[in-house]
Every structure is written in C-alpha cells, then in structure tokens.
Regions:
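Glycosyltransferase catalytic domains, chiefly GT-A lineage
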Residues: 1-181
C-alpha cells in the first residue's frame, strides 16, 4: 500500500480503537461477508453499527480527497471491516471456511455447483443487457415484473450464472398457492 492507503487504514483502525498490527496479523483470516457469529451481545452490535457509520463517513471523505485505484478498499465495505475488526478487538478468532465460499454473478453457469452460495455481486451496469443486474432493482421488484411478464428476463445469456437467480424467482411465482382454510 502507498502512503495514502496507509493513512486510510490508520484512520479506520482509529475508529474501531484497534491496533493496526492486529489487522495485519489477521489479514489471512478476513474474507467476504458470509458469517456465522457466536458469543456477541447487543452492545457489540451497537458498537459495530456506530463504528461502521463513522468509518463510512471517514472513508468517503478520504476517497474524495485521494481517489483510490480500482481494487482498493471501497467505502461500501465499512460495515464489513467494522464487524471483523471489532471481533478481533474482543479476541474472537475468525476463519475462512469453504462452506461459506461463493460464486459471483459474473461467473459462467458451469461454476454454479462448485460452491454453496451464489453471491449476486460483480455484475456492473455495462453487463446489464446480458446478465441480471441487481442495481436496476433498487426501486423495482423483479418478482413483480416476472409476474406481469414471465419472459421479462429472456435477454439474459443462457451461460450466465445469473440465469439461476432468475430461475429461482420464476419458481417462486409459479408455485401453487395453498389454501389452508
């Protein structure tokens, strides 16, 4: 990391109140955002929330002053770092598990059965005419659109792993309704 990136890491550590050496020591035990968390309480989650908000704010200000290169830490990950670093600060051990590994929305459909989770991330706006782009559905419901037109997503490439996500939504709306009365 360059000097500017080092400063950002220092600022992030300051928010949590954690020593940077602890972060460096545990680097190999930091992964994505799939967690199984035990032995925490409401005070822990309150601190994670408050720290992530402050960290996001600091990261945003930093990014405006010193635009980071592609592949660097991104502001939207503030909550992930807050959670992870607060766990480490309290002495919790973290491990990366293949059981929580995932395939990306940008992957080819052949990878679908290789990992247990389909993480609908990575698809960018320039890909939205070939793959399912969740960014188009912040204020629209894709299931409702499928109810109105079952072929709504027919533009998705058959080899795109995102077709599995669409297939899942289709199966949801095609399930028979059960009358329990």
């Amino acid at each position: 990391p360059n000097c500017k990136t080092e400063q950002l890491i220092d600022d992030m550590c300051e928010v949590i109140g954690v020593d940077k050496e602890l972060i460096i020591k545990n680097k190999e035990n930091s992964g994505g955002a799939q967690y199984i968390i035990k032995n925490t309480d409401s005070n822990f989650w309150k601190k994670v929330y408050e720290d992530s908000t402050e960290m996001y704010h600091k990261m945003t200000i930093f990014q405006k002053r010193y635009p980071l290169k592609k592949g660097s830490v991104q502001t939207w990950t503030a909550e992930m770092w807050s959670l992870l670093w607060n766990l480490w600060k309290l002495g919790h051990e973290t491990k990366i598990s293949e059981e929580l590994d995932f395939v990306w929305g940008t992957d080819n459909i052949q990878k679908f059965f290789e990992k247990p989770i389909l993480h609908m991330a990575g698809v960018t706006e320039d890909m939205k005419y070939r793959k399912f782009f969740k960014g188009d559905f912040i204020n629209k419901n894709p299931i409702q659109l499928l109810k109105e037109d079952i072929n709504y997503f027919n533009f998705i490439e058959p080899k795109s792993i995102t077709i599995k996500y669409v297939d899942n939504m289709k199966s949801f709306i095609q399930k028979p309704k059960i009358d329990y009365l």
